[in-house]
Amino acid sequence: MTYISRTMLWQRYLGTRISSTILPVAVRRIHYGGGRLQDPRYVFSKPPTNDPNQSKEGRDGKHFFTPSVNDGTENSTLHNNSRLSESEMSSIANAIAEQKRKRLKRSIITIFSAFVTAVLGYTIGYKVWYLKEQSFIPLYPCSRVRKLSTRDLRRVSVKKIEDISEVRVLERLSQHKMIQEEYGVPLRDSNGKAPHVSDFSVWCEDQDPCVTGLVFEPDSNRQSSHSWYRIPYVFKWRITHRPISISSFIDDVLNWINVSTSDLFEVISPEKVYGSFKYEYPIQGDNHSLHICFLGEMKLDENTTVIYKGKYHVDVKLERIDLLRTENKKLVRYILFKEEDEK
């Protein structure tokens, strides 16, 4: 019989007590269910199944908070119940589109405000206040044809143009064979007197494209023929029309880089600007190509009227003369003179 001391018995007793206390904490027990071992990945959750009607507690962990879609079958009942209606989807889409439109509108307003601020700051703040110079802001293109301004009327005599054009028209009519045969020479109207102009109009035509814009100047007491809108002690402004000279713009760009047009080419073409008046002097004060055009009407009798058109630059230059006459209750036009026919 083996002798066991009290010390060994005491050690065995303590070891048994300690192991019985520690092992339940450190060792995981494996439970058996249905004859199969439980998957250790789903100790704290239930494994997924292929049953579409299973509860949420038995679903796949990847779709715990969202409905799953079965492969090869229609969407689950929960998924169908959670689908948004067409009206709700349309409302969401409209809200997103409205938000985008508001954002785009804010961006456009910001860019436009920055552009206007920069233009006004340079035009008024720098050129008018600092440099004390005149500045011009173009707004929109305008027609090349315009009425004579008050300043133009002081430099051009409309009565003189009317009288000279009347003489030139009578000269042309007296040389025409149709007028000589049907009305005779010297030409007389129904009252037996020399025909006179009954209606006459004058206007300007710029050769260069024109724009309408705002002119700014420092506010001063200097007299001017123009009507100004004023902000006292700040600046004054008015609306005006100005031509855009492409050749002058090119000259300015070349001068900025210390190159002149004479270094590149030299073209002399007075016919382009002054036509047949290349040996005449232009009107003083004009810094761009400007034509003064006129249209006149002269009656020969109750059924016959002469209409003529031309340009004025120191002298009158006729472009066209038409005769309008009523024949068999119809208005017939005869072209008596046309400038292109003589070239």
Curated annotation (Swiss-Prot):
The chain crosses the membrane at residues 108-130. Disulfide bonds: none annotated. Residues 67-84 have a biased composition (Polar residues). Keywords: Membrane, Mitochondrion, Transit peptide, Transmembrane, Transmembrane helix. Residues 54-63 have a biased composition (Basic and acidic residues). Residues 1-29 form a transit peptide. It is found in: Mitochondrion membrane. It comes from the Eukaryota. Residues 41-84 are annotated as: Disordered. It is a single-pass membrane protein. Belongs to the AIM39 family. This is Altered inheritance of mitochondria protein 39, mitochondrial. The gene is AIM39.
